[in-house]
Design a protein with these regions (language model features):
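A recurrent flexible, glycine/aromatic-enriched loop bordering the glycosyltransferase active site
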Residues: 32-55
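Catalytic donor-sugar/metal-binding loop of nucleotide-sugar-dependent glycosyltransferases
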Residues: 70, 82-97, 103
Length: 246
């Protein structure tokens, strides 16, 4: 365990039920694809956010005042706070096995997602109808992050679409005073990194889906470079099986 921050461990869900096993394979594949794509886009928030699979240093936990009181997504928001103050390490050396289960306890999360995927594969057992993020969406994110980095150095014009999506997130409020409040580009970059956090990254992607709509997860994985695809399916045998039948 590091002296501060958190470690997020790789995980996989386990189920003896063949339908749930197929559904969770797609869900885990989607989440791994999301994290890998964030990393490729050079996001500072490229880590899984499943609470059962991370450990937090006690001092860091106290610093961020523990778990936020929310009906759902507590793990996501806790790690988002930690990422702004400490380092989050993603470890793939140890994989934690979790029993897959259905749940209506919260409106979003693993349980509700599995139930939605079950509805999809009951109509389409191949799993091809399960949609995930368009790969072009993350290239768009990478461009946005580069332009934000350029803005930290000096005021500049954003791409029209990128600028409009950032403005929908309230970018103008921080942009209007950034260069007058912070003299160094490093300070400005740090401030922008904290503003464009995990939540705003996710909201940015959702807003940009009007330009880059979702597409089949299996179809996307199939055309990924082999190394990228293997990093997602190597510990997900059921997903590998679904891909081979695609």
């Amino acid at each position: 365990m590091p002296k501060s921050g958190a470690i997020v461990y790789a995980h996989r869900h386990i189920s003896k039920d063949p339908l749930i096993s197929k559904a969770i394979a797609l869900y885990d594949g989607h989440m791994s694809y999301y994290v890998n794509s964030l990393k490729a886009a050079n996001s500072n928030y490229a880590y899984p956010t499943l609470g059962s699979t991370f450990a937090i240093h006690a001092e860091t936990y106290a610093q961020v005042r523990g778990y936020p009181k929310r009906n759902a997504g507590e793990d996501f928001h806790l790690l988002n706070k930690i990422a702004k103050t400490s380092r989050i390490q993603y470890s793939t050396e140890t994989t934690i096995g979790l029993e897959a289960r259905l749940s209506n306890r919260v409106p979003i999360g693993t349980g509700p997602s599995i139930k939605k995927i079950l509805d999809i594969i009951e109509k389409d057992p191949s799993g091809q109808s399960y949609l995930s993020y368009n790969p072009l969406l993350f290239k768009f994110l990478a461009r946005a992050l580069k332009e934000i980095c350029s803005f930290a150095r000096a005021p500049c014009q954003f791409d029209e679409i990128i600028g409009s999506k950032l403005d929908e997130l309230g970018f103008q409020k921080i942009a209007s005073t950034l260069h007058s409040h912070y003299r160094s580009s490093d300070q400005r970059q740090e401030n922008l990194d904290q503003w464009f956090d995990a939540l705003k990254t996710l909201r940015f992607l959702h807003k940009a889906e009007s330009h880059y709509p979702k597409q089949s997860l299996l179809g996307t994985l199939r055309v990924l470079p082999r190394k990228e695809r293997e990093s997602i399916v190597s510990k997900n045998p059921k997903l590998s099986e679904l891909l081979s039948n695609f």
